[in-house]
Amino acid sequence: MTRTLLQTYGLKFHPFRPDVPIEALYVTPTLDAFLRRVELSIADGGYVMITGDPGTGKSVALRLLKKRLDGLRDVVVGIIEHPQSRISDFYREVGDLFGVPLQAHNRFGGFKAIRARWTEHISTTCSRPVLVFDEAQEVINSVFCELRVLASKDLDSRQLLCVILAGDQRLPERLRSSELLPLGSRIRRRLVLEAASSDEMLACLEHLLETAGNSALMTEELKATLVDHAVGNHRILMNLCDELLSVAADRGLPKLDEKLYLDVYAATPKKAAKRR
């Protein structure tokens, strides 16, 4: 179905799905400036935090940041896949990411081995390894505390790691607690994502359509309507567009317009009312 849909509308890829190519991601000036600041701070290590409500663009920011870091010489990026792990599993995952064999039931041995690997990497490349936590609000306190000690050296005067934390608004709230304040106070770079303006939402949508290969897929009126109803949330905008494109393909429509929007979304409340 997806291949047929792409051929029907002359699209290189589905523009409204999360797995769009990296070049299709829209970069605002604020995001670009943040990415450059993080790039410049990699050599020194430390902590970076990206926060925002669901749908404001945290995953996009992480994808773009990883792409830029992957382009830097000798930078090794590891991504924590299970942020809810307890300390023992956290050590196992970090060991796997950085190629450090760990022995079970020997946390101190793992502590020393991982720090030795990071120290060796720094001495040979002059660059800190990078560890990324998505959904970082799910990380338990004991792992956060262990991470803070694991990543620092020489009485906290040196950082062995660049840590990138991304999460919703619960993350900064947790880092203000008395137990986690020592970690929260170490955050050097912050990006707070909020609801996007109408101009940013429209620019994002137009960039997606142009990059996908069909800038004329939607009428200008429909774009404006979608932006208004998405209330600054990129995920809502993509879901609205995805549904319209699927219905248009099913009906054999050559273009998406306001009439289609009204047919699809204005009918929903009426159906719900009839069921009641």
Task: List each model region and its residues.
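Conserved Walker B catalytic segment
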Residues: 47, 116-119, 123-165, 178
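Walker A/P-loop nucleotide-binding motif
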Residues: 44-64
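Short regulatory helix/loop adjacent to the ATP-binding pocket of P-loop NTPases
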Residues: 66, 171-186
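Conserved NTP-binding/hydrolysis module of P-loop NTPases
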Residues: 11-18, 85-104
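Short conserved motifs of the RecA-like P-loop NTPase core
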Residues: 108-116, 128, 204, 216-229
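C-terminal alpha-helical "lid" subdomain
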Residues: 3-5, 160, 182, 199, ...
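Conserved AAA+ ATPase "SRH/arginine-finger" region at the nucleotide-binding site
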Residues: 81-83, 175, 188-200
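A short, basic N-terminal segment
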Residues: 1-44, 266, 270-276
